[in-house]
């Protein structure tokens, strides 16, 4: 019992000790951690606590986080003794001023965050003591001025952010002490760019040249250079004027204690700063109170002393330059004086063998002693020729060449020693350094004779021919280097040429001979002949030629030029080798020999025999196609699940969603092509395994893989055959007037030309490694012309990406935007449906392989993105056209792989209406029967936005933090790519509905289909007119428009299809016109409150239109802001190469690298082949490119990347070509674009200028179209625009009221007819009777000839009244030619025969009492029924008679068609619903 109390006592004692320990710990924590703050080790976080002052923290604190409080000021010493502090976060407070000593004792602070406060001023010594500071963030404050000494105490500062403040001016030298600077941001300030800011421009240029630092600063004022980078500003633009001296000082003698004045006045812009020099050293007025600089620049020296004696000079200096006065001397009269020069030696020229004297004398007390040395301070040689005169001069007799050089005169006494230097320039006889060589050239060429010489003085080069003066004409030119250039050499130019080097000493001469050979047109030395070969063999077609100059040999197959590839090889002499011949290679081959004199051609026919034998792959067909269907479908389904079941997770997902086809037919066609090619790949692998050979080697022939009958079987099972379209162009009433949505039947002879979902055309034959489907560069080790191809990403970072842009002084950003909008009317490549490789289903971005369909863009080892762990960028190949890549459309041969254009090639507003009937129906408002397009939400302006797309989560809902607004729905699925493009789609959707409503008012008898198609026709014509009359002339320039030529009418032999190189490389030049910022401007052309949008934030962001002001601010930012100038050294801004589709924690894409990779994927031949195609000179060395790419820096980069000119990819080469004056294109790019746009125009039967498409009155009105008018009519509230919105104009003087912009008068589309109630209805009772007349002959000028009218009258007389009972009709027969009687008689006989058949049919039907209508339904005699709401039919005596109800004019302005009613009615509440 005694033990228990003891235990209780012990227990109580332990409890007391525990409580005491806890109290001690708590007290220690309380002392170091402020109330309500979170403290962990040396980190203190006091966020969102409404603090108004800096709390006290422990001295060992390394991170102090005071964000999101209400701190208004920082007291000096607030952080005293926090010497361990490394990071200080004070952003998002209310600090207004940074006082001196605010950060005392923070010598180890590295990171200081002060952004998003209300800071207005910073004291001069505010950051003193921050010797370790590396990063300082002051952006988003209210700073207006900066003291130049504010940052001089920060030797280690690497990053300084000052953007989004109110800084207008910067004092020179503000950042000059920041030697460690790597990133400086001054953008989004109100910088006034005048002469005072040129020091900053020089600093930014220094940063850019060194490459060690990045900086951003843009001008806000004056308006004419608003948005320009400060680095691009020049003194000339700002009218800066160098100083000029207006009053000079004079020599002065003074005694001790007096005052002396040296006068100096200067003028300049800006006002020059006056600086005084004494003995070439700047005087400091601060260190000597006796020195004063007066307001007018005069130097006043008070209480003169002996130390003031010397040579004075005034220097006037400003940002544009400097000027100096003459030197004046201040002599101090008194005790011992230092030496001063009375006469200084001067530079002297002397002839060899003559004598020379350099004078030198000085004064001082005591009298100075004169001595001489050479310039390097070595004593003069002991030479009897060299003497010093009694006055101190240096005298040299019989001067030799070795006497040339620098000499120094020293004047010394007991007080001081001074010296002066001069040169003796010994003049010598000329000596040649470059001598001309004899040349043999061909008549008409240009020849250079190089000649250069040296001597003293520099000799002059003079040329003679045979001792006589050269002809005085433009052909003979002596360049400044001394080279003689003879242009267009003629036979009489042959002879001896003398180069003479002449100076005052004498002359030298050297001769060279010119031999001129006459020009000779190409003559064939060997020619090919018709040949028949077996499939799978290699064949060589001989062709060689002779001529002067030596001809170049090219080959064409069926009109398309052949290029070097795995399939074709052209030897140096011109022989064409075709590897692995298949039936696809059969055809006509033409060998063309060209030189500057002319050309010659010869052709042959190659026939290919296909022996009926089994092939190695036949046994594997069945199993391979089953496996191919399974693997392809599995990969596609996996991709669809990944993309459509959740939000986009990465830029890869965004790109895939953006490009993924939505039309079921497109998906089916792409799937079939993938299955077909995958099947043959599997067969190839089986054969390779069975034969144990390398099928990738050149010895294996693909045409031996599978026999033709099995290729047809694979085509059927894969779905290729099922997806062949059968075109029906029989409805000529429609096709003669309107376009189909898919582009078919435009060319009636070739209905598929230019249609959607067809293969791109080719200017040159495709280039694949294996000749069929393997891209160049897929094997990174394979050499081309002795060099491996560079990675596309390396080309992008080395050659294309740029952070510096130059504003276009002529054209607005709308020039770029129209180009992109137009491009989306012309082409869209169908990419692979799967993001995973077919072999094992792994995602392409994770495996970084080239297994189909993957073709990853590899990242070079030294790329900045390697740090994030990325090895590649996502990329999948484009889907092949069914039957290409492995087989022909006949499914019996191997054809090179071709790609699918998802759009119609014609300029037909397919981006507004869609390229298939399925797409067109999805965007039409079919319910209203008014011919309108569907509309979305209506804004405050009363105008609607585009409708929202429906379906699974889309690319527009990529970020949960942004507004969950889905994508807009338009005719092209890329409408949401960026906000500027979305605004253009909105404009044209509104334009359709505006025109449709107007046409329906003018023609209330038209049904919805008529209104829709007439409006679509007008909108397409407007886009054509804007493109060819307003946009193309600015892109092509005068030279390019001449290449395009005038419109001469429709040519059915021209294929208007888009050629592959245009879509894949050439028209992507527009990427170089894109600004990194989308500007948003209000009605006063000032930034809207939400600000501008960086490009990487403008992708897939429709919520910014819905929630942030609509389309008007974006449109003003397009036509009210200068575009990006296309400069070969400033191509794609880094928003496109480094932040494309960027998302958090992911690797963004690179548009330039994607463009290059896509070109290789599509088998686009190298740049050199297109040069030859465009009749530019062949370029076999990089020096040969100097005429088109003048920059030696760019040529050196190309050589470093590609090694050979024959390897250069087309896209980067087109981008770096120098612009043809007056255009925005280089010569090769101009050739390609003018070719494509000429084909688009001339090969379009329904081109708006083609006679008969529109009436003359309608065409006149259409030519009033302008994009300015479209903006005025369809924006929310834009009231002022330029007449030409593509050209830069100054607001408001260069802008016009919308009332002054010409408009299209739609009244010329009003029907003038007696039968209007049915004339405009597609499905009306009389459509088949009156259709063709109303479509073709609505206007007086369009009426046919007399005989044609008689034939039509006959057709009406005998055909119309019988067509109720017959199915045959003759309205579509072509009329006989006026002079062709035989043809006329034959046609009449045919009409009579058909009429007899109709009569017989009518008689048989009249014999019965029942009637059978057009749908095959029987009706009893004397019965009536409604065929449609407006038509009542009656069966009487076996004859059907129908009556159409006539509609009375409606009593309201906007009648509505109600389902089931014939005529439009007025709703009772129509007036009440009006706003």
Curated annotation (Swiss-Prot):
Signal peptide: 1-23
Origin: domain of life: Eukaryota
Phenotype upon gene inactivation: Homozygous mice for the PXDN gene show completely or almost closed eyelids with small eyes, having no apparent external morphological defects in other organs. In addition, mice show hair color change and the tail color is white and also have a white spot at the ventral and dorsal region at a frequency of about 94.1%. Some of mutants have severe cataracts in the eyes.
LRR repeat spans: 58-81, 82-105, 107-129, 130-153, 154-177, 179-201, 402-425, 1148-1172, 1267-1288
Known tissue expression: Highly expressed in the cardiovascular system. In the embryo, expressed in the corneal epithelial layer. In the adult eyes, expressed in the corneal and lens epithelium. Expressed in lung.
Needed co-factor(s): Ca(2+); heme b
UniProt modified residues of type Phosphoserine: 1177
Activity regulation (UniProt): Thiocyanate inhibits the formation of 3-bromotyrosine.
Residue span(s) of domain Ig-like C2-type: 243-329, 339-425, 430-517, 518-607
Keywords in alphabetical order: Basement membrane, Calcium, Disulfide bond, Endoplasmic reticulum, Extracellular matrix, Glycoprotein, Heme, Hydrogen peroxide, Immunoglobulin domain, Iron, Leucine-rich repeat, Metal-binding, Oxidoreductase, Peroxidase, Phosphoprotein, Repeat, Secreted, Signal
Its EC number(s): 1.11.2.-
Catalytic activity, reaction form: L-lysyl-[collagen] + L-methionyl-[collagen] + H2O2 = [collagen]-L-lysyl-N-S-L-methionyl-[collagen] + 2 H2O + H(+); bromide + H2O2 = hypobromite + H2O; L-lysyl-[collagen] + L-methionyl-[collagen] + hypobromite = [collagen]-L-lysyl-N-S-L-methionyl-[collagen] + bromide + H2O + H(+); (5R)-5-hydroxy-L-lysyl-[collagen] + L-methionyl-[collagen] + hypobromite = [collagen]-(5R)-5-hydroxy-L-lysyl-N-S-L-methionyl-[collagen] + bromide + H2O + H(+)
Sugar-bearing residue positions: 387, 637, 696, 716, 728, 961, 1175, 1277, 1364
Localization of this protein: Secreted, Extracellular space, Extracellular matrix; Endoplasmic reticulum; Cell surface; Secreted, Extracellular space, Extracellular matrix, Basement membrane
Binding, Ca(2+): 825, 904, 906, 908, 910
Site for Transition state stabilizer, residues: 974
UniProt modified residues of type Phosphotyrosine: 1173
A GO molecular-function descriptor: heme binding
Presence of the UniProt keyword Secreted in the record: yes
SMART domains: IG, IGc2, IGv, LRR_TYP, LRRCT, VWC
Family per record: Belongs to the peroxidase family. XPO subfamily.
Protein name (Swiss-Prot/TrEMBL): Peroxidasin homolog
Organism: Mus musculus (Mouse)
Gene designation per UniProt: Pxdn
């Amino acid at each position: 019992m005694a033990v228990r109390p003891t235990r209780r006592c012990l227990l109580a004692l332990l409890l007391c000790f525990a409580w005491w320990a806890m109290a001690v710990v708590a007290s220690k924590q309380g002392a170091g951690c402020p109330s309500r703050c979170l403290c962990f080790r040396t980190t203190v976080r006091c966020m969102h606590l409404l603090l108004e002052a800096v709390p006290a923290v422990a001295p060992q604190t390394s991170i102090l986080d005071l964000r999101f409080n209400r701190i208004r000021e920082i007291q000096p010493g607030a952080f005293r003794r926090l010497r361990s502090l490394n990071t200080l976060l004070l952003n998002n407070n209310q600090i207004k001023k940074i006082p001196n000593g605010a950060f005392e004792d923070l010598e180890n602070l590295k990171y200081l965050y002060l952004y998003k406060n209300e800071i207005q001023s910073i004291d001069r010594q505010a950051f003193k003591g921050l010797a370790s500071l590396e990063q300082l963030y002051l952006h988003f404050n209210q700073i207006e001025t900066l003291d130049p000494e504010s940052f001089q105490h920060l030797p280690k500062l690497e990053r300084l952010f000052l953007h989004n403040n109110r800084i207008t001016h910067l004092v020179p030298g503000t950042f000059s002490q920041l030697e460690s600077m790597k990133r400086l941001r001054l953008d989004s300030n109100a910088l006034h760019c005048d002469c005072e800011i040129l020091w900053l421009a020089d600093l930014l240029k220094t940063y850019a040249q060194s490459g060690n630092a990045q900086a951003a600063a843009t001008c806000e004022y004056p308006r004419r250079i608003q948005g320009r980078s400060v680095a691009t500003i020049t003194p000339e633009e700002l009218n800066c004027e160098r100083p000029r001296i207006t009053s000079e000082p004079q020599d002065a003698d003074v005694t001790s204690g007096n005052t002396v004045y040296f006068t100096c006045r200067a003028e300049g812009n800006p006002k020059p700063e006056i600086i005084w020099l004494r003995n070439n050293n700047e005087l400091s007025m601060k260190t000597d109170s006796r020195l004063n600089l007066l307001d007018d620049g005069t130097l006043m020296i008070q209480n003169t002393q002996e130390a003031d004696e010397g040579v004075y000079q005034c220097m006037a200096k400003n940002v544009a330059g400097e000027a100096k006065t003459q030197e004046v001397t201040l002599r101090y009269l008194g005790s011992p004086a230092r030496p001063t020069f009375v006469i200084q030696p001067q530079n002297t020229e002397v002839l060899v063998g003559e004598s020379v004297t350099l004078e030198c004398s000085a004064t001082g007390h005591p009298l100075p002693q004169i001595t001489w040395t050479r310039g390097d301070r070595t004593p003069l040689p002991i030479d009897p020729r060299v003497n010093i005169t009694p006055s101190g001069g240096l005298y040299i007799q019989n001067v030799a060449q070795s006497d040339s050089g620098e000499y120094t005169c020293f004047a010394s006494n007991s007080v001081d020693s001074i010296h002066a230097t001069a040169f003796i320039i010994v003049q010598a006889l000329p000596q040649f350094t470059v001598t001309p060589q004899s040349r043999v050239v061909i008549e008409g060429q240009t020849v250079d004779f190089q000649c250069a010489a040296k001597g003293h003085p520099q000799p002059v080069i003079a040329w003679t021919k045979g001792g006589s003066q050269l002809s005085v004409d433009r052909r003979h030119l002596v360049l400044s280097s001394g080279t003689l250039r003879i242009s267009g050499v003629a036979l009489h130019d042959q002879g001896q040429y003398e180069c003479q080097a002449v100076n005052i000493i004498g002359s030298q001469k050297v001769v060279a001979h010119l031999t001129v050979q006459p020009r000779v047109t190409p003559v064939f030395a060997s020619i090919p002949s018709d040949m028949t070969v077996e499939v799978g063999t290699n064949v060589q077609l001989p062709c060689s030629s002779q001529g002067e100059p030596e001809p170049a040999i090219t080959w064409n197959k069926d009109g398309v030029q052949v290029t070097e590839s795995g399939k074709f090889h052209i030897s140096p002499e011109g022989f064409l080798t075709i590897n692995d011949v298949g039936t696809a290679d059969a055809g006509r081959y033409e060998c063309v020999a060209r030189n500057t004199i002319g050309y010659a051609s010869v052709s042959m026919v190659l026939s290919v025999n296909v022996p009926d034998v089994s092939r190695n792959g036949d046994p594997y067909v069945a199993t391979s196609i089953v496996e191919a269907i399974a693997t392809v479908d599995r990969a596609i389904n996996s991709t669809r699940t990944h993309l459509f079941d959740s939000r986009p997770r990465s830029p890869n997902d965004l790109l895939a969603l953006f490009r993924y086809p939505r039309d079921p037919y497109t998906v089916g066609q792409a799937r079939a092509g993938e299955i077909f090619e995958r099947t043959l790949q599997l067969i190839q692998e089986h054969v390779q395994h069975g034969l144990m050979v390398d099928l990738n080697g050149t010895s294996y022939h693909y045409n031996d893989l599978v026999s033709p009958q099995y290729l047809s079987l694979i085509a059927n099972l894969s779905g290729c055959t099922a997806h062949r379209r059968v075109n029906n162009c029989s409805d000529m009433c429609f096709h003669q007037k309107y376009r189909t949505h898919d582009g078919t039947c435009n060319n009636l002879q070739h209905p598929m030309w230019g249609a959607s979902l067809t293969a791109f055309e080719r200017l040159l034959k495709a280039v694949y490694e294996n000749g069929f489907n393997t891209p160049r560069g897929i094997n990174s080790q394979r050499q081309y012309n002795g060099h491996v191809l560079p990675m596309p990403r390396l080309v992008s970072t080395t050659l294309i990406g740029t952070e510096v842009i130059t504003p276009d002084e002529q054209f607005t950003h709308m020039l770029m935007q129209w180009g992109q909008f137009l491009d989306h009317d012309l082409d869209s490549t169908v990419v692979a449906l799967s993001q995973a490789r077919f072999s094992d289903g792994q995602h392409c971005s994770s495996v970084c392989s080239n297994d189909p369909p993957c073709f990853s863009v590899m990242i070079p080892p030294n790329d900045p993105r390697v740090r994030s762990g990325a090895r590649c960028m996502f990329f999948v190949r484009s889907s092949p056209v069914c039957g290409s890549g492995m087989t022909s459309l006949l499914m019996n041969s191997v054809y090179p792989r071709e790609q699918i254009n998802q759009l119609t090639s014609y300029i037909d507003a397919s981006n507004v209406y869609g390229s298939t009937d399925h797409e067109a129906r999805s965007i039409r408002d079919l319910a209203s029967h008014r011919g309108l397009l569907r509309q979305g939400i209506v804004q405050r302006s009363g105008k609607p936005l585009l409708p929202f797309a429906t379906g699974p989560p889309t690319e527009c809902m990529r970020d949960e933090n942004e507004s969950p607004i889905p994508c807009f729905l338009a005719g092209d699925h890329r409408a949401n790519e960026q906000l500027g493009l979305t605004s253009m789609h909105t404009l044209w959707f509104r334009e359709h509905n505006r025109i449709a409503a107007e046409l329906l008012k003018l023609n209330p008898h038209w049904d919805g289909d008529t209104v829709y198609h007439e409006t679509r026709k007008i909108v397409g014509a407007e886009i054509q007119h804007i493109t060819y009359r307003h946009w193309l002339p600015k892109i092509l320039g005068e030279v390019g428009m001449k290449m395009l030529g005038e419109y001469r009418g429709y040519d059915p032999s021209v294929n208007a299809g888009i050629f592959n190189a245009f879509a894949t490389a050439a028209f992507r030049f527009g990427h170089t016109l894109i600004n990194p910022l989308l500007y948003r401007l209000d009605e006063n052309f000032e930034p809207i409150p939400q600000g501008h949008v960086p490009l990487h934030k403008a992708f897939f962001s429709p919520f910014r239109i819905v929630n942030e002001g609509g389309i008007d601010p974006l449109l003003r930012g397009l036509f009210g802001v200068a575009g990006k100038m296309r400069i070969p050294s400033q191509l794609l801004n880094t928003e496109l190469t480094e932040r494309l589709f960027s998302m958090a924690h992911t690797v963004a894409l690179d548009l330039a690298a994607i463009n290059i990779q896509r070109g290789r994927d599509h088998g686009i031949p190298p740049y050199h082949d297109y040069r030859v195609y465009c009749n530019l000179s062949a370029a076999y060395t990089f020096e040969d490119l100097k005429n088109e790419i003048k920059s030696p820096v760019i040529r050196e980069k190309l050589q470093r990347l590609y090694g050979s000119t024959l390897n250069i990819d087309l896209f980067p080469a087109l981008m770096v070509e120098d612009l043809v004056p007056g255009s925005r294109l280089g010569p090769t790019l101009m050739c390609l674009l003018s070719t494509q746009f000429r084909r688009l125009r001339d090969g379009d039967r329904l081109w708006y200028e083609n006679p008969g498409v529109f009436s003359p009155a309608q065409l006149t009105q259409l030519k009033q179209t302008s994009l300015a008018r479209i903006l005025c009519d369809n924006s929310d509230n834009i009231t002022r625009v330029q007449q030409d919105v593509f050209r830069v104009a100054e607001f408001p003087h260069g802008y016009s009221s919308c009332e002054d912009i010409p408009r299209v008068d739609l009244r010329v589309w009003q029907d003038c007819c007696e039968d209007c109630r049915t004339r405009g209805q597609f499905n009306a009772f009389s459509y088949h009777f009156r259709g063709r007349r109303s479509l073709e002959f609505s206007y007086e000028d369009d009426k046919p000839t007399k005989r044609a009218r008689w034939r039509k009258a006959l057709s009406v007389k005998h055909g119309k009244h019988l067509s109720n009972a017959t199915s045959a009709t003759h309205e579509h027969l072509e009329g006989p030619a006026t002079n062709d009687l035989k043809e006329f008689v034959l046609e009449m006989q045919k009409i009579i025969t058909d009429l007899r058949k109709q009569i017989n049919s009518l008689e048989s039907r009249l014999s019965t009492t029942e009637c059978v209508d057009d749908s095959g339904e029987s009706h009893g005699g004397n019965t009536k029924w409604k065929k449609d709401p407006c038509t009542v039919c009656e069966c009487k005596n076996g004859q059907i008679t129908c009556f159409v109800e006539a509609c009375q004019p409606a009593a309201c302005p906007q009648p509505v068609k109600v389902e089931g009613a014939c005529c439009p009615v007025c709703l009772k509440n129509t007036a009440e619903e009006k706003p």
